Amino acid sequence: FYLMLPFYKLFPHVETLEVLQIWVVFSAVIPLKLLLSKLNLSKLANILTILWFVLLPVLTTAGGYHLHENCFLVPLIFWVFYFIVNEKKWGILISTILLLLVKEDAFIYVFSIGIFFLTQKRFNLTNKTKKWLVITEFLLPLLYFTLAMYLLSAFGEGGMVSRFDAFLLKDENGVLTVFKNLILHPSFAISHLFMAKKLGYLFLMLAPMCFLPLLQ
């Protein structure tokens, strides 16, 4: 949000923040365009991909509610992808750190990116890059999350565990308990993931992407 401060100083209005939030989200077009240039797709495919991106409802409604730090996730995730595909060591590190700094639970996104690139066969990454990914996409986010939770507990009101209430049993609390239930009680966790309401939500999220994530 400090990146928005100079603009808000010049134009101290609520509308300024809303416009800036939209610009931040759609700045992801830059790393997306750079990433597409590495995929050797046809010109038409590149145009359609960018068009799909800018028309995706979940992005076009980014400024429809209120100012939220999640607006920084979209461009930063694309930058992490771009630097990994190009095997830019320091680019991977810097973009990953910036992504983690958005929020304490951003480590989930970083973990997911790391798992994808270490298991996929689309990009031929060198062993050196894969080792670097283990450090930046697994060890670093784990250390960051541990430190962030400590600081939030010691100097704040703790992490926002309430969003994980579905994975907590009666009278339970804490992030560690969530992880414990995911490991020791997987059927309990799965039963809460695949409820009718949530399956409907997944359908609405995947339909605009033609269910392509399920093919990976």
Kindly give the residue locations of the regions a language model identified:
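Perimembrane helix-loop-helix junctions
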Residues: Y109-L142
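Short acidic/glycine- and proline-prone juxtamembrane loop motifs at membrane-interface regions
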Residues: A62-N70
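Membrane-interface alpha helices of multi-pass inner-membrane proteins
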Residues: F78-F83, W90-F117
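Transmembrane-helix signature of polytopic, membrane-embedded enzymes
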Residues: W23-L55, V74-P75, W90-I94
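Loop-to-helix entry region of an early transmembrane alpha helix in multi-pass inner-membrane enzymes
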Residues: F1-L5, L10-I30, I50
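Membrane-lumen/periplasm interface segments of specific transmembrane helices
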Residues: K130-Q216
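Membrane-interface transmembrane helices that cradle and orient dolichyl/undecaprenyl
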Residues: K38-N40, E69-F72, I77-G91, L118-L125
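Membrane-helix interface segments
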Residues: H13-T16, L39-I47, N86-I92, T129-K131, ...
